[in-house]
Amino acid sequence: PVNLECSINPEIIDIVCKLKPARATLVPENRNEVTTEGGLDIKGNYEKLQKAIDKLHANEIEVSLFIDPKNEIIELSSQLEVEWIELHTGTFANVYAMLHTNLSQTHHTIKELELSKAELKSKLEKSIKEIESSSKFAKKLNLKIAAGHGLNYQNVTLISKIPEIIELNIGQSIIARSVFTGLEKAILDMKELIKND
C-alpha cells in the first residue's frame, strides 16, 4: 500500500484525496509547522490539521502524523483521531552519528552535539528510552506506530528492537547504498538488519 508524505496545505490535501493512497503521512513543510526537533507542531497547527485529517478520512485515507516522541504530542495526535503516528528519530540519529562516526571532525558537525563520548552515550540512551516510552504510550492509545528520519544501516537495529514500532520509514540510506550494491541487495541488507527473530 502507498503511504504518501505531504504537507497540510489545502491544495496538496485536495490532490492527495484525488490520488487516494492507502495512507497519508502529514509532515512539516514550512518553518512555522516544525517543532525544534523536527516533527509537526501539533499545538500550533491543530485546527489546520483537523481540517486536513477530516478531509482525508472522508476520502477513506488513513492518516499518520510525523511527530516528536513526546507523550503530550502523542495525546494530541490521538485526539485528532489519526490511525498512525511516525516518531521522528532525527535526534537519535544525530546523536548516534556524533558518537559512532567521524562526523564531529567534518564541516558537517552538529555544534550542539560536540560533547564528550560519555555525554553522547548518555544522550543516546535517553533518546532511545524516549522513543521506547513514547511507543508504549502510543500503543496504549491504540495508535499504530512507525518511526523514521536519519535511520540507516548503522543505527537501525536499536530502533527496530522496539516491539511497538511496526513500520520503519527509511529512504535515503537504502537508495544511497543501492548505487553501489543495486536496489535489491540494498533492500535485502536492510531487511536482514531489522528482522527480529
Predicted regions mapped to residue ranges:
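C-terminal alpha-helical cap/extension of soluble enzyme domains
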Residues: 139, 145-196
